[in-house]
Amino acid sequence: MRRRTLITFTIAGALFSCACSRPATDTAEEHSPDTYKVRFDTTKGQFVVTVTRAWAPLGADRFYSLVKSGFYDGARFFRMLPGFVVQFGIAGDPAANTKWHNANLVDDPVTQSNHRGTITYGTAGPNTRTTQVFINLANNARLDSKGFAPFGEVTEGMEVADKFYSEYGEGPPMGGGPDQTRAEAEGTAYFERDFPKLDYVKKASIEK
């Protein structure tokens, strides 16, 4: 089984996204507005992401489609590294994970720096963005040259992102935190059984 590295270097190890060999299904994207806001209601409170399509058009379109479809509703903040990033984007519904698993996006050019508060897709190398994203909890400009293209930023409630549960630590093979392969396959049941303290998205919605 091949594993997908989201960020090729970190303060405390690599960020991973599993990548099993499964056929992709129809995942056509809707053209997003030039600017739009997404409100995340979470177990720690609310935060708002403002997306600017010009920063990363393909990434902005994908995020718009995922939010509108309810993909992020119930998604755990399964990897929290205080002072670096918080990562999410594995759906609670295994069928949704299967649908989007191999729906890779062509890379957008990096037009903005990965400063604190920006939101960016993880990658497994060139042209491999799917659903997993991370919020930069610090100024991570060193990621810019690695191809990580921010498509938006947290404009309200950044203090909420700083508070997500972090004690489970790194996932395998570096630690005992959530295993992304199992999380994709089992969804919410896996997190509730083995990692019940993780914070999660109650509802993500496009603001009118």
What is the meaning of each model-derived region?
Residues T10-F16:
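Hydrophobic helical h-region of N-terminal Sec-dependent signal peptides
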